[in-house]
Amino acid sequence: MRLCFILFLLLSPLISEASQHIITVKTIHEIASDILYDDANYWLIFDIDDVLFEGAEALSHSAWFERSIQGMRALGTSEQEAWDTLYPDWLSIQRQGSIKQIETAIPLLITKVQNQNKIVFAYSERKVCAQDVTLEQLAKINLSFEKANLPYTSLPSNICFTKGVLFGSEIHKGPGLQRFLDAQPSLPEKVIYIDNEKYNVLRIGEVCKQKNIPYLGIVYTASKYHPPIYLPDIARIQYLYRQKLISNEAAALLSRHRLDK
């Protein structure tokens, strides 16, 4: 009997630990039914860049920002310093640029989940200062998360939850959602998180593990199968003429005629 009791004590943390599942999909259709027919009172959380939409120009695409940070780091700048230095340029470019929806089925899925009275919101690394342009971009593709009227206590000044969008002001996903969960009067029965980067999906999984929240992480790779928008040479030309952001086609024409020299 004593041995059984000891085994129970040793195994009980494993028994009570919340489940974690990570899957990779090419299209939202592969997982839509699982989400819609999940009986749990879950939160469905979407990343924004390269999941809901992507920049339609090489310069406005998230890849330009990422590559620019990598370039500054190669010169010895810290990741945080590079991010902070480039952010004003990135924000100005977002205000000028246009966007392309990744997959038309996503708004339909969001509407269906909202009609089930379940929580759906977006979570981005973007800074609080980007909230206006972000909400404008979402409106352009007729996406609204305003139904996610979640109560919460105070948040740090660099984190903001407005109109169903959580702005984490962070280089890497995780801390923003952690603080948001800390501010909740009650936790969800489950979190379903969709992001195009696996490392972000894993980080959110760690946050949910700490909170003992069952988790389904979805690595959403649809954008990788689209024709590339970010092209370094095109982005370079667009940066030269960034006072009025030109399209990839116009930049390619300038390149062919050597008008950028």
Swiss-Prot record:
Lineage, top-rank taxon, reads: Bacteria
Cysteine-cysteine disulfides = none
Q: Which organism is it from?
A: Chlamydia trachomatis serovar D (strain ATCC VR-885 / DSM 19411 / UW-3/Cx)
InterPro entries on file? DUF2608
Signal peptide positions (record): 1-18
Signal found in the keyword field = yes
Please verify whether the record's keywords include Membrane. yes
| Pfam families listed in its UniProt record | DUF2608
* Cell compartment(s), UniProt: Cell outer membrane
How would you describe this protein's topology in the membrane? Peripheral membrane protein
Q: What Gene Ontology cellular-component terms does the record carry?
A: cell outer membrane
Write the protein's name: Putative outer membrane protein CT_371
Major place of residence? membrane
Key words, A-Z: Cell outer membrane, Membrane, Signal
